[in-house]
Amino acid sequence: MKNIYPNELKKSLMQKLHYFYIFLGEDFFLLEKNQDMILNFAYKKGFLEKIIIDVEKNQDWKKIILFYKTNNLFFKKTTLVINFLIKKLNVILIQNLNKMFSLLHPDILIILKFNHLSRFIQKNKSLKEFKNYNIVSCFTPYNLNFINWIKYEIQEKKINIEEKAFFLLCKYYEGNTLFIYKILDMLFIIWPDTCITEKKIKKIIIEFFDVSPSYWINSIFQGKTEKSFYILNIFFKKKYNPLILVRSLQKDLLQLIHMKREKKISIYVMLEKYNIFVTRRKFFIKAFNKINNDSLLKAIQILVKIEVNIKKKYNNYVWNQLQELILILCN
């Protein structure tokens, strides 16, 4: 099994275009970007046709069988994208996947996209054949993987940026692949032949602020105090409605409290039960293990007080209380 990260895909394709790729991960932006890159390289190699088959239920596998049956010796080179949207893979689908490897053909380039099933695929021992093929990582990158990806994109766009400005970008936008990509495009357009400083990045962050409350909550759940303060400060400068922050955090904290009470049930089962988005589950798991019950209850009490202060229009005091919340939950 060869894992190819987003910053390595172009180089890999330039070396050799393979006829079978497996996409693991659920980052929508990376899924689309990596797919487009392979499709472009494939087109240049003569794969002029593209077929997309969505597998939403077991019966949809018949569409794949039909695709192979209806193609003859004279059909054009084709890229077949199989997009798994089904909730679970059963035994029959796993067997069909294993049989698929016997159908591989040099004139059919296959992209298998597993989306939310990716973790299951990684752990499943029944899919032994997968280890022989290229796996393209479409998981949202974090830490070093995120830094490497941003470095690659900056080099591709030929952006000149100071080290401090670069790390501010990484620190602030980590986990938000689509938005940072848009920011990089913006930097290239605004300052094409200029060294981008930390001051310019700070200006961009404030002027083009487009972050949801969940992004702020994720940073709290990660225990990143400084980043949480930074995001909160931008919410304050932008005169964001603090009640939205309160309600969003309140909802997530109450879910954490309920999860902690269900001691006999696995955290993974609970995440499924409460319909926590796949992209946010790692943050909930970290908070579940890190934040104790006393801190959670104290935070809920403060949130109630904040809501009262919002109704009384004690707005400046509200933001101080939100800072206090960050300290309680991050430490």
Swiss-Prot record:
It catalyses: DNA(n) + a 2'-deoxyribonucleoside 5'-triphosphate = DNA(n+1) + diphosphate. It holds the Pfam family DNA_pol3_delta. Keywords: DNA replication, DNA-directed DNA polymerase, Nucleotidyltransferase, Transferase. Disulfide bonds: none annotated. One of its GO terms (biological process) is DNA-templated DNA replication. GO terms for cellular component: DNA polymerase III complex. Its EC number is 2.7.7.7. One of its GO terms (molecular function) is DNA binding. DNA polymerase III is a complex, multichain enzyme responsible for most of the replicative synthesis in bacteria. This DNA polymerase also exhibits 3' to 5' exonuclease activity. The delta subunit seems to interact with the gamma subunit to transfer the beta subunit on the DNA. PANTHER family: DNA POLYMERASE III SUBUNIT DELTA (PTHR34388:SF1). NCBIfam families: holA. Belongs to the DNA polymerase HolA subunit family. DNA polymerase III contains a core (composed of alpha, epsilon and theta chains) that associates with a tau subunit. This core dimerizes to form the POLIII' complex. PolIII' associates with the gamma complex (composed of gamma, delta, delta', psi and chi chains) and with the beta chain to form the complete DNA polymerase III complex. This is DNA polymerase III subunit delta. It comes from Buchnera aphidicola subsp. Acyrthosiphon pisum (strain APS) (Acyrthosiphon pisum symbiotic bacterium). The lineage of its organism: Bacteria, Pseudomonadati, Pseudomonadota, Gammaproteobacteria, Enterobacterales. The gene is holA.
